Amino acid sequence: DMILRKKDIHLLLLEDIQDPGNLGTMLRTGEGAGVTGVIMSKGCVDLYNPKVIRSTMGAIYRVPFLYTEDFYGIITKIKEICKVYAAHLKAKQYYDKYNYKAPTAILIGNESRGLKEETAALADILIKIPMLGKVESLNAAVAAALLMYEVYRQRRN
């Protein structure tokens, strides 16, 4: 509840992130981008894994976070107060077509599988990152960083 009562909500929702370095990097980057909370599915790597802690560079102590067994229930509750954008390869629109000045949650899926279809279906909007070359997707932490900083960039101006 504390995470959802913040002013200027900017949430990062993580489903089944497995790599400790990725999770730590997302927390550290989230702090830099002004994320007000990180909510993780029970399938995410342990936040207290030594590699996660090192990767956060202290952000683990400053960014509110929550593990939940009811990830779908939390997303449904979040949708009552903010718009949920899911990074998804099947999205029709690029992330930079949207206004993120209202309360916003960014949903990122597992490094190799992406979001489960039922999780993606809960999002208000599916977004994608434009790609050149033959690259299909970015590293989960890199994609999360890009999207979190777009929210910050729009709100900063």
List each language-model region with its residue ranges:
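Short, charged, surface-exposed secondary-structure boundary motifs
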Residues: 74-76, 95, 136-142
